[in-house]
Amino acid sequence: MLTSVVCTLFEGDYHLGAAGLVNSLHASGFRGRFICGYRGALPFWAESSKSEPNATKVRMLDGIEIIFVPLNPAIHFTNYKPTFLLEAWKEIAPDAPKIYYLDPDIVIKCPWDVMERWAEGGIGLCEDVNFYLPPRHPIRLAWHDWLRSQNIIPHASQRERYYSGGFIGVPIAARSFLELWRDLIARAADITGSLDSIKHGNPTSLFHTIDQDALNIALMCTDVAINASGPEGMDFFSGGSLLSHAVGSRKPWRGGFLTNALRGYPPSMASKAFLNYATEPIPIFSSLSLMRLKATLTLAAFIGRFYRRS
């Protein structure tokens, strides 16, 4: 039976988030290949991996085949996503009917069959925090002007939603969308000057969040079906049951819950979700460290009931 493939990219302490993603995949019922592109040293939870050609490492984990691929592109990992997905599909998983990408600060809360359905017959996406971007919004009009300068025709100019680049599910029939996304990111470098950072300029810049803006511009250039959830799909708003995305610099594996709460930033839903997937099959923390994290999160959440920044 052909199985879908899941990918992520990480460097630095984001390997702790990637371990939480693996644990959540396992809890969801996913069994198959999980491809990790990484920069720097292998994480501690990859130590039992076996060496394979091209310097890759493979670890089997109760039905999940974790493949570690060393990378060192000259651009920020977030701008490397479509390139990595295309390479993984071609070189590692050419038989996969679908490929998924999730940022390493995301965990999955739903059963895997829901994830499979999400990318059935269309591209699986989740709306971003700032999700409404109507067809005649000035930013979108600027994108239209830029597309004309690139001799690209926007076939779906009436898109009105703005989607997160932290998650995408692509069926094989829509594989060419990844090529378009990759191409637009490369063209964006002529505007931004480089692709070595997540952000560029200010919120009104043509490309502010480069990979994410390029993703949404690519959606204007194709009539591919979009299978989307609202922003609650990543726990940006309450009521979500699909994914949980710990956006921003306050990552749950770094702790600091009490300090942040006293500054008016209570623990996010994503912080709570991450700790739910911190124990198995990969123990991310020692028992004592996890107990402390959970205790401080509980206290910080209590403080947040009475004090938070508006």
Identify the role of each PLM range:
Residues M1-H76, K90-D95, F285-S310:
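N-terminal anchoring/stem segment of glycosyltransferases
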Residues M1-L2, H155-Q158, R175-S310:
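A glycosyltransferase accessory/donor-loop signature
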Residues A18-A19, T78, P82, Y162-G165, ...:
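Conserved glycosyltransferase catalytic-site signature
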Residues A27-R31, K90-K98, D103, P171-L178, ...:
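Secondary-structure boundary elements
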Residues I35-G37, K98-D103, I108, G124-L125, ...:
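A structural signal for short, well-ordered beta-strand segments and their strand-loop junctions
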Residues L42-S51, P135-I139, K199-T204:
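Short, flexible/disordered intra-domain loops and linkers
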Residues P82-P135:
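GT-A fold catalytic core of metal-dependent nucleotide-sugar glycosyltransferases
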Residues D113-D183:
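Conserved catalytic core of nucleotide-sugar-dependent glycosyltransferases
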